[in-house]
Amino acid sequence: MKLSPIPFALALLALAPLAGHAQPAGQEGRLAQLYAPRPPAGSAFVRVLNPGSAALKVAVGNGAEQSIGPATRATRYAIVEGGKPFTLRVAGTPRSQPKVVAGSFSTLVLDPAAPSKPLLALADGGGTSDALKAEIRFYNLASGCPQGRLAMANKGAVVFPAVAAGSSSARGINPVKARLVAGCGGKESAPVALPALQPGDHYSLFLTGSATAPILQGQLSGTDAVGR
C-alpha cells in the first residue's frame, strides 16, 4: 500500500507527463509533499479499527490519541519501528503489541464487547500497485456474517462476492463515481457513495452491525505525519 505522503506524491509525479505544463488547482500542494520528511528506514504502518457502537480513545506508538467508533471507524496509520514490539493505548490503558514487519501496513481490530482482549491483526497488503488507479479495501466485521458481499447499488456489478468474517480484500479501481451496498445473505446495507477519489488514494469500506442489520461505512485512509 502507498498511503504515506512520499509514495502518494511520487504517484502524482508519474502522471505529470500526461498533464503537460498545466497544473490543476491544488496540485502544487500535493507535489509539495515530495519535500516532506520521509518515514525512517525500517518503518511499519499500523492503525486501529473499532467496529463497535461506542467510541473509544486510542493511540498507537507515539501517535496522538484519536477517537474511533461509529463516526470514524479507524485511526490514521501510525508510523512504528518494524521488527520491534510497540505500545498501544486503549481508553488510557497501555499494552504492548507484537512486532510487525518493516514496510508493512496493518489494521488492528478491537473486540467491541471486550476491548481488553488481544486485537485481531489484518495485513493490508496485496492491493493494487497501479499508480493510475485508486484502491478500495472491504472489511467484513459484521457479527454473524460468515461471508460479506460488496456490490454496486441497485443490483449492479458485484465488487467483492465473498469476504470471510474478520478479514478484508482489496482491488484497484478507476476513480469514478459509484454507490455501493454491502450485506450478508439477503440483507443489504443502506447505499454509500464513493467520494471523488484520486489516483493513488486508498479508501476503506467497513461492514459492521450484524448479518440481519448490516451497516456500511467508508473512510479515506491516511498516515500520521513523520515525527508525530
Where are these regions (language model features)?
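Intrinsically disordered, low-complexity polar regions and short flexible loop motifs
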Residues: 23-228
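Bacterial N-terminal signal peptides that target proteins for export
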Residues: 1-8
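Sec/Tat signal peptide C-region and signal peptidase I cleavage site
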Residues: 18-22
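Hydrophobic helical h-region of N-terminal Sec-dependent signal peptides
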Residues: 8-17
